[in-house]
């Protein structure tokens, strides 16, 4: 089955074969005329497969003859009105052997089934032959040849003037058969058919080869309606709420008013960043319907699926990474796809957004926030005084607005990546990263480190080469040169108690986390006053990496010094427990609960001891 559409192969020949009661299997009509003979196709060598035994009838038959592929759907109709109590016919299509005929096969099957019904209803095909030899006229013949005068002896009297009722010449026989055929048509109550099989074959051949569809009327109520569709590989059934659809075409340009309403409502939110769950929420659509729409888009190669981009993800190179070196087109596509636009400011964001108020002298900020230097006092002495709680909140708000502005610009630039496989950007005053650089970056990914750790170690390389890390990861996943290691939470004592006996989750202050946040805040403030080495604050990392998020709630919580965990509802508790029993990934659990990974881990700690399995 095709993985992508390559076009329809033209039909070489189409012919109509029928079983003649006295001559056997024969070709009645073909188009183009004499095309079989001109190309050395001998019908007698395979006629037993065209009009086969009853066991092979009403089945699609495909076989090879020389350099040709023959596809047909033989039909046999049993009825006492026919000369041999049956009528067999077949519409046969001939193609070049080295081609894909699967798009034609459903149409050929439907064509045979349709004419089977038409023949059963009004003898459409048999009457079009204009030959009474196809019908059983024995009864009529016997009734005609019966003497009109009854008597004990059946021997004709030579002296009698009675005219014999049996035909005396070949002409009389032909006239009698024609008369009986007309009587048969009259007895059946059916009009004479003006249907032409030869004309039908010609129009099917020309229309399918030229337009891949045909609409040929047969009578007032029937028509041959065929449209050829490409048969592509069916989409995966493993489409989940946490998957992120990436459009490979501009969906807004191909959208049609006749599309499904759900499909039209979700198209504006397919930007390469939103998960299916978020698309469902933003479009106010049922998640099940959204998944079905995404599967349709996947089938027609308009959308591919990716994971939610998170710095807590773990990626590693696959065995197909060698294709990056052997396929020059892949490398060149990667070079142009993974680079930032020249005006992008996303690289100015710090690695840890919870870091202090923006020390200009800090190494972790100097290369990322040059554009922000004007908003920070240039005199170090002016920052030697301790900050009050109010000034911290004010400075965090300023930092929040800066982050939001940069992230908004970055998100708008990222949505363009889902409209084309190759990112077309402004090439003025910009150099593409080398292929060896990109290969080394892909090769350096490993299962032993999160994406955040990898990004911190490769930050300067990514910045100097103007590489967008999200595009970099997305391209590797699409080309299958890297793969992701998924994380599954597993409760250690999950099998020892029933779900209803699990410890209820209560509202609780995260004392340890608050202390950790207060410690970070204190260190950052000391760093801002110049009394603490900035390298110490830069080395602080959370115990567990969480998914990347540019929300400012974390920074605001630093100012208050406390954070609380809201209690899960009964429905959310059931979702969490069921997800654990079903061995769902952290991504899906976070999406189902609409909570970040750090909070989900805290809820899991309340349920009991658990471990994380990476696979």
Curated annotation (Swiss-Prot):
Disulphide bond pairs: none
Comp. bias regions, Polar residues: 527-539
Protein origin, superkingdom: Eukaryota
InterPro entries registered for this protein in UniProt: NPR2-like
Knocked-out gene: effects: TORC1 abnormally activated in presence of rapamycin.
Keyword Ribonucleoprotein on entry: no
Modified residues (Phosphoserine): 362
GO BP terms: cellular response to amino acid starvation; cellular response to nitrogen starvation; negative regulation of TORC1 signaling; positive regulation of autophagy; proline transport; protein transport; regulation of autophagosome assembly; regulation of TORC1 signaling
Main location: membrane
Pfam short name (any one): NPR2
Skewed-composition ranges (Low complexity): 143-167, 373-398
Membrane topology field: Peripheral membrane protein
Compartment annotation: Vacuole membrane
Keyword Protein biosynthesis assigned: no
Region: Disordered, residue numbers: 143-176, 354-398, 527-551
A Gene Ontology cellular-component term: GATOR1 complex
Record's function text: Component of the SEA complex which coats the vacuolar membrane and is involved in intracellular trafficking, autophagy, response to nitrogen starvation, and amino acid biogenesis. Mediates inactivation of the TORC1 complex in response to amino acid starvation. Post-transcriptional regulator of nitrogen permeases. May be involved in putative NPR1-dependent phosphorylation of nitrogen permeases or in the processing and targeting of nitrogen permeases at the level of the endoplasmic reticulum.
Family designation: Belongs to the NPR2 family.
Extra facts: Present with 319 molecules/cell in log phase SD medium.
Record text on subunit structure and interactions: Component of the SEA complex composed of at least IML1/SEA1, RTC1/SEA2, MTC5/SEA3, NPR2, NPR3, SEA4, SEC13 and SEH1. Forms a heterodimer with NPR3.
PANTHER family linked to this entry: GATOR COMPLEX PROTEIN NPRL2, NITROGEN PERMEASE REGULATOR 2/TUMOR SUPPRESSOR CANDIDATE 4
Protein name: Nitrogen permease regulator 2
């Amino acid at each position: 089955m095709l993985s992508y559409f390559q076009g329809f192969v033209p039909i070489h020949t189409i012919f109509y074969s029928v079983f003649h009661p006295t001559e056997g299997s024969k070709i009645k009509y073909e188009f183009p005329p004499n095309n079989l003979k001109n190309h050395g196709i001998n019908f007698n060598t395979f006629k037993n497969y065209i009009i086969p035994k009853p066991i092979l009838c009403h089945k699609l038959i495909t076989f090879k003859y020389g350099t040709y592929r023959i596809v047909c759907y033989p039909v046999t109709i049993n009825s006492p009105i026919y000369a041999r109590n049956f009528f067999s016919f077949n519409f046969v299509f001939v193609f070049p052997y080295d081609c894909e005929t699967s798009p034609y096969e459903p149409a050929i099957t439907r064509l045979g089934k349709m004419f089977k019904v038409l023949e059963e209803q009004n003898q459409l095909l048999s009457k079009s032959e204009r030959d009474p030899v196809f019908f059983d006229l024995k009864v009529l013949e016997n009734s005609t040849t019966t003497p009109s005068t009854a008597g004990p002896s059946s021997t004709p009297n030579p002296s009698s003037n009675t005219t014999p009722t049996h035909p005396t010449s070949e002409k009389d026989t032909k006239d009698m058969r024609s008369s009986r055929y007309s009587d048969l048509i009259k007895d059946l109550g059916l009009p004479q058919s003006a249907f032409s099989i030869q004309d039908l074959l010609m129009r099917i051949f020309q229309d399918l080869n030229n337009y891949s569809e045909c609409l040929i009327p047969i009578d007032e109520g029937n028509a041959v309606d065929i449209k050829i569709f490409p048969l592509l590989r069916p989409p995966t059934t493993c489409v989940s709420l946490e998957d992120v659809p990436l459009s490979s075409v501009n969906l807004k340009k191909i959208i049609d008013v006749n599309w499904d309403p759900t499909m039209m409502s979700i198209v504006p939110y397919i930007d390469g960043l939103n998960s299916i769950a978020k698309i469902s929420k933003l479009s106010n659509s049922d998640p099940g319907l959204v998944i079905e729409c995404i599967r349709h888009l996947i089938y027609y190669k308009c959308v591919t699926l990716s994971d939610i981009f998170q710095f807590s993800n773990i990626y590693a190179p696959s065995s197909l990474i060698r294709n990056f070196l052997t396929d020059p087109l892949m490398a060149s596509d990667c070079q142009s796809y993974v680079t930032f636009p020249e005006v992008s400011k996303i690289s100015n964001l710090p690695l840890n957004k919870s870091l202090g108020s923006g020390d200009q002298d800090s190494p972790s900020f100097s290369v990322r926030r040059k554009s922000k230097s004007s908003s920070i006092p240039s005199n170090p002495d002016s920052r030697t005084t301790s900050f009050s709680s109010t000034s911290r909140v004010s400075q965090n708000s300023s930092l929040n607005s800066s982050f939001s502005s940069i992230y908004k610009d970055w998100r708008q630039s990222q949505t363009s990546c889902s409209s084309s496989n190759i990112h077309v950007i402004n090439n003025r005053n910009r150099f593409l990263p080398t292929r060896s650089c990109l290969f080394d970056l892909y090769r350096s990914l490993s299962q032993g480190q999160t994406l955040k750790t990898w990004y911190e170690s490769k930050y300067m390389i990514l910045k100097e080469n103007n590489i967008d890390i999200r595009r970099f990861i997305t391209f590797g996943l699409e080309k299958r040169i890297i793969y992701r290691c998924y994380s599954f939470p597993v409760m250690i004592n999950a099998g020892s108690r029933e779900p209803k006996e699990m410890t209820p989750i209560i509202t609780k202050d995260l004392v340890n986390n608050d202390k950790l946040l207060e410690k970070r805040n204190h260190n950052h403030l000391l760093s801002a006053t110049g009394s603490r080495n900035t390298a110490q604050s830069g080395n602080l990392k959370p115990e567990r990496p969480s998914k990347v998020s540019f929300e400012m709630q974390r920074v605001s919580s630093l100012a208050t010094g406390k954070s609380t965990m809201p209690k899960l509802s009964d429905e959310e508790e059931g979702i969490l427990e069921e997800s654990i029993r079903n061995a769902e990934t952290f991504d899906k659990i976070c999406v189902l609960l609409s909570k970040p990974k750090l909070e989900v881990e805290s809820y899991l700690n309340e349920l009991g001891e658990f471990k994380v399995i990476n696979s």
